[in-house]
Amino acid sequence: MEYGKVIFLFLLFLKSGQGESLENYIKTEGASLSNSQKKQFVASSTEECEALCEKETEFVCRSFEHYNKEQKCVIMSENSKTSSVERKRDVVLFEKRIYLSDCKSGNGRNYRGTLSKTKSGITCQKWSDLSPHVPNYAPSKYPDAGLEKNYCRNPDDDVKGPWCYTTNPDIRYEYCDVPECEDECMHCSGENYRGTISKTESGIECQPWDSQEPHSHEYIPSKFPSKDLKENYCRNPDGEPRPWCFTSNPEKRWEFCNIPRCSSPPPPPGPMLQCLKGRGENYRGKIAVTKSGHTCQRWNKQTPHKHNRTPENFPCRGLDENYCRNPDGELEPWCYTTNPDVRQEYCAIPSCGTSSPHTDRVEQSPVIQECYEGKGENYRGTTSTTISGKKCQAWSSMTPHQHKKTPDNFPNADLIRNYCRNPDGDKSPWCYTMDPTVRWEFCNLEKCSGTGSTVLNAQTTRVPSVDTTSHPESDCMYGSGKDYRGKRSTTVTGTLCQAWTAQEPHRHTIFTPDTYPRAGLEENYCRNPDGDPNGPWCYTTNPKKLFDYCDIPQCVSPSSFDCGKPRVEPQKCPGRIVGGCYAQPHSWPWQISLRTRFGEHFCGGTLIAPQWVLTAAHCLERSQWPGAYKVILGLHREVNPESYSQEIGVSRLFKGPLAADIALLKLNRPAAINDKVIPACLPSQDFMVPDRTLCHVTGWGDTQGTSPRGLLKQASLPVIDNRVCNRHEYLNGRVKSTELCAGHLVGRGDSCQGDSGGPLICFEDDKYVLQGVTSWGLGCARPNKPGVYVRVSRYISWIEDVMKNN
């Protein structure tokens, strides 16, 4: 080990950072470290900060922060592993990847983790100490070898990996048990594999994740930022037994990849629980009975049900005996049953303390724009989307961001699910985001206008309006206000803005009329030259406050009724239509009832334009004569429709191309668009709904005796990738690329007969988009048989052509 010719060892250590780029850093917006050892510089770019960090000699620079508006750079000796992380405005944290890693690549020559015990458990001696062993490798001799404190290192390129001198006088040195990084091999089921293997086990080249050719799919990289879906590298984004990819062979949709298992043990798991927290992925109790009383099948057995959720495929998921577990990210722990007629079911696991199940389930924001009073500290609405459209992280979750704003630490702040809140008195409600690169953002909420208004709570929604009496109608913004050109010149706290050309009280060189000539930096008006997602801002005339945001209202849409935006907010409903929940009247205003000319309801449909309805082609099998049908819009009751509902006949029928189960109905006259009748939005051509997106089905269909018919019902269903849906145990290859699946695989209901032709509607950004037409399924609410829907995005050209030419 240390008996080689040390004279040449310096060749092994290139200057840290030489040739590096920002790709070697982890970036997190809105995060700041509490660091004692740091230096501050003036810097206008992140590249300048990086150069300062690489040149630092007084301490090892592990991270830096760049403050854009302050033109400031702070380089630091610590990172998020050794220092607490705080949320902060206008800062981007950059941390060197090498110092965040707790694993080794190859022989660990570049390992810079903090393990300080040997394989046998002996504490390491500090590299700078001379006792009990005089070291041959010391920080002074090898300054670039990372010989800090008593951390395990490999300064001599030992093939056996990192080691250290020990504190045992009888044992000079010993190797350390540093786990291998998952860039050359995989631990567990390869969920964290980040290597570059890009061929399947049969040798087929992988299809890039951001491509939809030759196979269209739902795993869109931008929708899964934490899954590292880069290039065409093998990955495991969905809880499979091992990494896989879509293939470049049109005849072979997907295949597993041959990733070798790491020889070292996997990193230690999180705390193992005897109760249910979140989705129960860390549950290790001994309950072995399902909710309906079926005894669980042993995980290592293939009778009565064959499966691949075995201990061999999921070695880190605790698949012991026949205990309920959640190896694949389902809603809660489950098991295969010993009943041949019931493949799998959820288990009844008691919750941990006061935590409720599914607290990590991401909820969508309401379409009706909620508002808040004051700073929003008493806001109790259900918005869960940030101002830039990112989904909020649940307050009880530590993924992807570790934090201390938990329900236990702030019991009076109503930190429920992932709803926007203001537990710390910021300027408005905010949340941590589901994007690993953006720690937090303010939420997509407006301040309530007017006086004497009451505080919004979870049961009340209000539509904010612009106070045109105090500000001209043009003094409002769209989106983040990058194009705002109004004359507001005070911050949210009422402080007067500093002129953009002024250098007092705050000096600045970046955001001036000369450097940003097209940003409208006139006078001291609020502007957003850097595209800040939190909106327009300005430097302030307060010497102690460099900058602050301005309170600019959102512009009211010129359209009275936008597609996909109901005037009544749909309720959050955890059930399905079978045994599901009743919809709020008129919360799905595009839903139509397709009836015979005698008034009998037999199918659903979706209004997509004032004179056009989309439904299923099989709903029109009883007659090719348009006069045989009529639609009713704006109703909630199936029988005895409300007086304000609209009954309109059908003038023409258009069935989809190539016998697709989709059809357009042209109405005798345009529907009157009002607060009870609003069209749904259409998706873009060939858009793919990401896997596990929560969508909604509505209808008056069969509830199998679980609730009375007559009122419109709704159900929430996750989209399932066709690759999964077509497995033998589910729909066995029946689902086409022009169709999509949605439902719960563990056997609770979805849409049923009577809902045919109705919508599968998904929330996107700030509106509901029609992604599917209810088409078929194997029975109703049968276990392992999700519903199948025509993929509307595949027929956008056909829809547009029919409507344009007729």
From Swiss-Prot:
Q: Which UniProt keywords apply?
A: Blood coagulation, Disulfide bond, Fibrinolysis, Hemostasis, Hydrolase, Kringle, Phosphoprotein, Protease, Repeat, Secreted, Serine protease, Signal, Tissue remodeling, Zymogen
The species this protein belongs to is Notamacropus eugenii
Active-site residues per Swiss-Prot or TrEMBL entry:
618, 661, 756
Concerning its family, UniProt says: Belongs to the peptidase S1 family. Plasminogen subfamily.
Identify the Pfam families for this entry: Kringle, PAN_1, Trypsin
| Protein localization | Secreted
Q: What Gene3D superfamilies does UniProt report for this protein, alphabetically? A: Hepatocyte Growth Factor, Plasminogen Kringle 4, Trypsin-like serine proteases
Q: Enzyme class, one word?
A: hydrolase
What does the entry report about post-translational modification of this chain? In the presence of the inhibitor, the activation involves only cleavage after Arg-576, yielding two chains held together by two disulfide bonds. In the absence of the inhibitor, the activation involves additionally the removal of the activation peptide.
Q: List the disulfide bonds.
A: 49-73, 53-61, 103-181, 124-164, 152-176, 185-262, 188-316, 206-245, 234-257, 275-352, 296-335, 324-347, 371-448, 392-431, 420-443, 476-555, 497-538, 526-550, 563-681, 573-581, 603-619, 695-762, 725-741, 752-780
Q: What is this protein called?
A: Plasminogen
Q: Which GO terms describe its molecular function?
A: serine-type endopeptidase activity; signaling receptor binding
Range of residues in the leader sequence: 1-19
Catalyzes what? Preferential cleavage: Lys-|-Xaa > Arg-|-Xaa, higher selectivity than trypsin. Converts fibrin into soluble products
Gene Ontology cellular component? extracellular space
Which gene name does the record give?
PLG
- SUPFAM superfamilies cross-referenced by the UniProt entry: Hairpin loop containing domain-like, Kringle-like, Trypsin-like serine proteases
